[in-house]
Amino acid sequence: MAEHDYHEDYGFSSFNDSSQEEHQDFLQFSKVFLPCMYLVVFVCGLVGNSLVLVISIFYHKLQSLTDVFLVNLPLADLVFVCTLPFWAYAGIHEWVFGQVMCKSLLGIYTINFYTSMLILTCITVDRFIVVVKATKAYNQQAKRMTWGKVTSLLIWVISLLVSLPQIIYGNVFNLDKLICGYHDEAISTVVLATQMTLGFFLPLLTMIVCYSVIIKTLLHAGGFQKHRSLKIIFLVMAVFLLTQMPFNLMKFIRSTHWEYYAMTSFHYTIMVTEAIAYLRACLNPVLYAFVSLKFRKNFWKLVKDIGCLPYLGVSHQWKSSEDNSKTFSASHNVEATSMFQL
């Protein structure tokens, strides 16, 4: 959903011909760039998250708390990316889907955005408990599974509640073309504060605190798996910062310095960083599922079952993967059955 749409026709009407020409160039660029990025994220996110869901449901039983979260995360991302074709069409043309669809898609878009970010936070906390409090976590696996299901349900409820402003105040406005959004400064401020708190600062602070302790714990541990785990942690942190920080920084600047709306370059920056931020829906399956040896084994089972690839030495690959993971599984029995092993 283009963040600049709500105000794209404000702050330019009184400018000279040069500024108007720059703004028209920006509008033409936005009609090409953002819809194309939306469609790329949609296709990649649809394929990746669908694969994770299919494998999680049909090839792997929910045997750990991490598995519970790894079902909810791709579900949220999948529904999220399914709203993008509508915004892509609206970016090229205008909003033609009516007021009910406007409110519905704003709600779906926002609910699944919050759900995805909150689940990422829970996955981080779960990793902390598994690595730092391994014995306690192992002895309370059944209780943790129950707690995980309750937490997942609570996350969806919280996401619905904090999305109510968009659902209630979302409407179709005619600003030279029909636009779906919420054109109210007070609502925009509330939405921005909520998005930055739940969608950026909470996951970021949780990652910093939990991963700092996890890294310290792993550095005192032995074995080859330590180095792989540290690489995964740094990769997760780097991807989160690179995709989410630029867009959130731009939104923060926009909320405190409204004069930037008069700068076409600022609109370009908002648009590009927004597209980068949405890449998380494509990268989450790679970061949180495909890094798992067990998940990759189940993926090849799926490929074999649907006949996409001939069965050529796959069993040897599975065996090799399982043998390579025995050392880690023996020392970290808590999540030995989980698809994701940190």
Curated annotation (Swiss-Prot):
One Pfam family recorded for the sequence: 7tm_1
Q: Which InterPro entries match?
A: CCR1-9-like, Chemokine_CXCR6, Chemokine_rcpt, GPCR_Rhodpsn, GPCR_Rhodpsn_7TM
Q: Name where it mostly resides.
A: membrane
Which domain of life does this protein belong to?
Eukaryota
Q: What is this protein called?
A: C-X-C chemokine receptor type 6
> An example Gene Ontology cellular component term from the record?
plasma membrane
Q: What is the tissue specificity?
A: Expressed in lymphoid tissues and activated T cells.
* Membrane topology, record value: Multi-pass membrane protein
